[in-house]
Amino acid sequence: MHLPHPAAPRHFLLRSSLSLACVGLAPASAQTTSESITLPQVNVTAKALPADRATNGYQGRAASVGTRTETPLLELPQSVNVVTRAYLEDRVPTALDEALSGISGIRQGNTLGGTQDALLKRGFGTNRDNSIYRDGMQSVQARNFTPTTERIEVLKGPSSMLYGIQDPGGVVNIITKKPLLERQASVSGWGTSFGGGGAQVDLTGPIGSHGLAYRLIADEQRYDYWRNFGKIRQQVFAPSIAWYGGATNVALAYEHMEYSVPFDRGTQIDTTTGKVLAIPRKRRLDEPYNVTTGRSDSLTLRADHRLSEAWSLRANYGYSSNYYNDYQARAMSFNANTGRLTRRGDATRDAKQDAHILSATLLGKLRTAGIAHELLMGVDYLHNYRVLGDLMRDRPNDSNFNVYDPEYGKMKLPSTVSAADSDQTDKLRSTAVFLQDTVYLGDRWIVTGGVRYDSFDQVTGKGRPFRTNTHVNDGKAVPRLGVTFLLQPRWSVYTSYSKSFRPNTSIATAIGELPPEQGTAWEVGTKWVGENLTATAALFHIDKSNVQTSVVVDGTYYTRVTGRARSRGLELDLSGQLTSAVSIVGSYAYLDAKTTEGPILRGLPLDGVSRHTASAFVVRDFGAVSAGRLRAGAGLRAHSKWGAGDGNGKVYDLPSAIVADAFVAYDAPLFGQRVTLQFNIKNLFDKTTYTSNSGLGSPAIAMGEPRQFVMRAKVVF
């Protein structure tokens, strides 16, 4: 069956870039091995090699996500985690939630059938919640963990003082690979036991001898989906250029992605038993045309200028976009007596989201009355526009699909455009000013305080003709205050108070003007940042108020903001080296998250939240073995049972799980180049796992991948 394909992969473009990159390897290699390159002395800031200060192997040392300036983790009065490049290379994740599986308090959210990034942070969050950033700028891309990822920073708790409109769970900031003034080149390829694999080229180095550098990353992935049908396709082309001019640094980066992924909402819950259907986990309940195809683009322009030894200016522009079409045979209801599933043909065509971000900040260091201050002040502008064009909603026209004896191919593609549901629109404009002051009181006390004022205009609605269901034009001030005390040069304790907000809007129904959702959090914790090991312990309490609820008065539904939710718990994180040969990333979280007020959901746990989660991944470096170096690692990921709600007061319990992973890697020289061979086993004991609720109102449950073998080879020139 021929399917409409809105973003046919530009194979010529990708293959041309791969060929060009490979041609560039020979001279780069020859120059590196046959002659030394002498560059003029250039005052290169940390922007050129950002990982040197921020990470050390598995250890995170500093991050920019917590203050919008690179700050030692020890001084930050909130819980901040860093997922390092070394850890990502050992674990070889393919999605953002998998990359963050070693961080406490983070779980997969509703990924819209595996087509969107979605993270629960301390119990809050969903897909397209604007909590994912790339190099400090908001991203609307569906798939943010790409081959350009250098490391990932996670700030937990309310963060509206720094990032504006947000849920109170936190934000994730992906730091991308930057052009380097040192010539490097690598080619890698991998294969999976699911069938298929991928290849990547990464080139970087100087252009001339005056501080100009480039980077080019090209990647293609083609492999089979692990269930009984489906294929995953992804192509990335990412050139960037930077000038490190001493007092002035300028960087321009572009990334283009085209993708085609299964739209798979997973399995179903039998509501008569409250348990997942007793069918093989590989069996899909939709059709082969359940596919999302799309493309995304990201463009960033950054300029930093040092005005003096104490003051610097930064200006950023970011553009992020995502365009997609999807088709699905959507499960609507299940008859437990007959085993038949009623399905409806749904589709979204010409869905697009764009975000334009402008930011200007002034950073200064000064002393007043003998007290040191680090000031950050700035202006942010955001224009985020999302519209879902044609919404197709066929009548439930297939009630003959038997989940125990399925026959595929009998349900036609959706074809009925719903005028009432089409052109679903969410348009947000926001302008903000902010001021943050970090005060150093002597050698031990650090006080960080700030305030932000956001002026925003948001319009939502749908339909042909278009109907505006929400128009909010308002402003909101949000504060932040934190205190850090250095018990020792490497050990600190901290406490913080922070707030968040999000306008109350509705695309589906008119709700009038309602006050925004608000999040308020208190947090206390302690941190140890040693030479090779970082440890964090945090206790937190988050209240979320003004949550939308529906009430019925004389048979009429009204929307009110009487709902409240609460999240509180304990988080422990450890990363770095235990010894010179043993590295670890470990975490544990206890999370009590539930709805505390509301006519239907009061007292129920927040969707998708496990009360207990834990992970540990330990790596041993065996040193020299024969002509190379041998490393091996293994670990566990575990969570307690969690609840999937139907939105109407019913919560279904999903079982706990413990999953093991392992890898072995061998580095050795070959023909004068460094070659790495790596073998990973994911889900070593082939456990069946359930990862998230994939549709509110429908008991559909996303499933974790079975055991997978991944073989990878990399050559560094």
Regions found by a protein language model. Give the residues of each.
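Gram-negative outer-membrane beta-barrel transporters
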Residues: 541, 561-646, 714
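Acidic/polar loop-and-plug regions of large Gram-negative outer-membrane beta-barrel proteins
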Residues: 221-225, 238-306, 319-353, 396-426, ...
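Conserved C-terminal beta-signal and adjacent last beta-strands/turns
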Residues: 31, 351, 375, 522, ...
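Membrane-embedded beta-barrel scaffold of Gram-negative outer-membrane proteins
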Residues: 304-318, 322-328, 493, 516-577, ...
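Acidic, small-polar-rich N-terminal luminal/periplasmic segments of exported/outer-membrane proteins
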Residues: 40-182, 524
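Outer-membrane beta-barrel translocator/receptor signature
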Residues: 148-150, 161-239, 243-249, 297, ...
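Surface-exposed extracellular loop regions of Gram-negative outer-membrane beta-barrel proteins
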Residues: 258-272, 383-387, 480-528, 534-560, ...
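Structural signature of Gram-negative outer-membrane beta-barrels, strongest in the C-terminal barrel
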Residues: 238, 242-244, 353, 372-376, ...
